[in-house]
């Protein structure tokens, strides 16, 4: 039990972070206007009449760009705490992060060579 002693604030954070979306969604469901006519079920397109079908198939290139973006966004998520504590971690942590960046760069070069980043 002594190991978990300092984690009360973390537990409180997770409970509050879980309750905020639940409360927001519940409040919006309780306070929303009821009813509505057939106009309410139509697609909203910037205040003008919808043109064409709402269901279209996106080009796969959008997904490839999104995937590459997410990979490098997660890289930033991992690199920021490392950069903040860089002086305390020492040389071994530097080489671990260097290997991490090299692996990501290999993935970027692979995606680039496969044409995943080309838009033509």
UniProtKB/Swiss-Prot annotation:
Protein name per UniProt: NAD(P)H-quinone oxidoreductase subunit 3, chloroplastic
Entry GO CC: chloroplast thylakoid membrane; NADH dehydrogenase complex
Gene3D superfamilies with a match to the protein in the record: NADH:ubiquinone/plastoquinone oxidoreductase, chain 3 (1.20.58.1610)
Keyword Thylakoid: yes
Family listed: Belongs to the complex I subunit 3 family.
Purpose: NDH shuttles electrons from NAD(P)H:plastoquinone, via FMN and iron-sulfur (Fe-S) centers, to quinones in the photosynthetic chain and possibly in a chloroplast respiratory chain. The immediate electron acceptor for the enzyme in this species is believed to be plastoquinone. Couples the redox reaction to proton translocation, and thus conserves the redox energy in a proton gradient.
Enzyme's top EC category: translocase
Keywords: Chloroplast, Membrane, NAD, NADP, Plastid, Plastoquinone, Quinone, Thylakoid, Translocase, Transmembrane, Transmembrane helix, Transport
GO MF assignments: NADH dehydrogenase (ubiquinone) activity; quinone binding
Subcellular location: Plastid, Chloroplast thylakoid membrane
Residues spanning the membrane: 3-23, 64-84, 89-109
Assembly mode: NDH is composed of at least 16 different subunits, 5 of which are encoded in the nucleus.
Catalyzed chemical reaction(s): a plastoquinone + NADH + (n+1) H(+)(in) = a plastoquinol + NAD(+) + n H(+)(out); a plastoquinone + NADPH + (n+1) H(+)(in) = a plastoquinol + NADP(+) + n H(+)(out)
Bilayer topology: Multi-pass membrane protein
Top-level taxon in the UniProt lineage: Eukaryota
A Gene Ontology biological process term: photosynthesis, light reaction
Keyword Membrane: yes
Family matches, as HAMAP family: NDH1_NuoA
EC number: 7.1.1.-
